[in-house]
Amino acid sequence: MTDRTDKAEYFIIKALENGVNVMGLTRGHDTRFHHTEKLDQGEVMIAQFTEHTSAIKVRGKALIQTSHGEITNE
């Protein structure tokens, strides 16, 4: 059996202002928030998708880096 976590992709979120919210959303028929973090300017969060997390929502100005590239939201 192969462990999925060693193949999971990581991504980086860097807060460009105080109060950036990072929210993890669940998988399944009923998508729900299951985890929230608040970052202040300059703080960095390294995260990955898991069997429970299918999406991430970022509210506030942040730099998001993945293996596919980077984006800054406003």
Swiss-Prot record:
One of its GO terms (molecular function) is RNA binding. InterPro entries: MtrB, Trp_RNA-bd_attenuator-like_dom, Trp_RNA-bd_attenuator_dom. It comes from the Bacteria. Keywords: RNA-binding, Transcription, Transcription regulation. Pfam families: TrpBP. GO terms for biological process: DNA-templated transcription termination; regulation of DNA-templated transcription. HAMAP family: Trp_attenuator. Required for transcription attenuation control in the Trp operon. This trans-acting factor seems to recognize a 10 bases nucleotide sequence in the Trp leader transcript causing transcription termination. Binds the leader RNA only in presence of L-tryptophan. Oligomer of 11 identical subunits arranged in doughnut-like structure. Belongs to the MtrB family. This is Transcription attenuation protein MtrB. It comes from Oceanobacillus iheyensis (strain DSM 14371 / CIP 107618 / JCM 11309 / KCTC 3954 / HTE831). The lineage of its organism: Bacteria, Bacillati, Bacillota, Bacilli, Bacillales.
